[in-house]
């Protein structure tokens, strides 16, 4: 019984070791230059925008959304915002997401609070740390 168990463990260990191979396309120097760790990954700030408590008339809402779009452009131009987009209507009232190329939740909160739609409570924002490929910031 011990021999059978040992043989099975040895066999599965061999398969596991064979499955662990380096990615020949992985560029460690590029990953490091983008702030990536040994795995080519880094922390980002993920923002989920939700419907807020403020429900203004259409003219005010349109003005706030215009400011929201201008803020998105400003953050993208600065390289701090790498993904932004709306979500399809859903039961959780999620309206959109941001992925920010910044290090801390505190900086994320400051940047999100610079958005007039968030400041006015037309949108609320939840912030999370998100671990993703350092190459995401190449898309900007």
Regions found by a protein language model. Name each.
Residues 1-22:
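Bacterial Sec-dependent N-terminal signal peptides
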Residues 20-140:
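Conserved, structured core segments of small domains
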């Amino acid at each position: 019984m011990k021999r059978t168990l040992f043989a099975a463990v040895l066999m599965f260990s061999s398969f596991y070791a064979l499955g662990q191979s380096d990615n020949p396309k992985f560029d460690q120097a590029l990953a490091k230059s983008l702030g990536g760790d040994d795995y080519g990954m880094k922390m980002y700030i993920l923002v989920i925008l939700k419907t807020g408590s403020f429900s203004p008339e259409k003219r005010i809402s349109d003005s706030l959304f215009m400011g929201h779009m201008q803020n998105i452009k400003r953050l993208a131009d600065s390289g701090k915002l790498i993904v932004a987009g709306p979500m399809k209507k859903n039961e959780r009232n999620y309206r959109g997401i941001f992925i920010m190329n910044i290090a801390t939740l505190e900086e994320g909160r400051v940047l999100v609070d610079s958005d007039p739609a968030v400041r006015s409570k037309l949108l609320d924002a939840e912030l999370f740390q998100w671990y993703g490929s350092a190459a995401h910031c190449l898309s900007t």
